[in-house]
Each structure stands twice: as structure tokens, then as C-alpha cells.
Design a protein with these regions (language model features):
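Extended, surface-exposed interaction regions
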Residues: 1-53, 89-92
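Contiguous, low-complexity intrinsically disordered segments that are highly enriched
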Residues: 45, 49-92
Length: 92
């Protein structure tokens, strides 16, 4: 879960109530990324290919939701939100 700890550090400056919303979503994204990597490494079966597609779509939905929330937060916590947006954009 090194990736989760990395993402978690980017939102550390945000208020606790916002972190409480984002942390479960970030955990889900990291889990989806790990599964995506497993399926990328072995996409030999139709099941793996279907799972890969489903998790990729889930990841994109989560990223869109987080970005929307962070754009709304930018007015108050510009630097932390900008940093997380930049990191999330690397994985699109």
C-alpha cells in the first residue's frame, strides 16, 4: 500500500472532514490500480479481459468524482488540491 500512503500524503493538508471523504475513495483507487496491473500482466482469458475493463472503468469514475470534489475545494485549499489533481492526472 505504498501508493495509498503516497496519495494520502497529498491530502494531509486538507481539513479532516474532507480527508474522511477522500481516504476511502483513494483506497479503492489504489486497490483498483493493483488489480489492473495484475490483469495487464496476464490478460490471457476472457474473464481477465472483462475484469480488466470493469476495473479500468471504475478507476476512471473514481478519478472523475475526486477531481470534481477537488475543483470545488480549490478555493480554500489550493496547494493540496492542486498537488493531488496533478498526481491523479498522471494515471489517466
Amino acid at each position: 500500500m505504498e501508493r495509498f500512503e503516497e496519495l494520502k500524503s497529498y491530502i494531509a493538508a486538507l481539513p479532516d472532514d474532507i480527508q474522511a471523504i477522500l481516504l476511502p475513495v483513494l483506497r479503492d483507487i489504489v486497490y483498483a490500480e493493483e488489480l489492473l496491473q495484475k490483469f495487464r500482466d496476464n490478460p490471457k482469458t476472457k474473464t481477465n479481459a472483462a475484469m480488466f475493463k470493469a476495473y479500468r472503468q471504475t478507476k476512471q469514475i473514481y478519478q472523475t468524482d475526486i477531481k470534481t470534489l477537488l475543483w470545488q475545494l480549490r478555493q480554500n485549499e489550493t496547494s493540496a488540491a492542486d498537488e493531488l489533481l496533478k498526481k491523479l492526472s498522471e494515471f489517466e
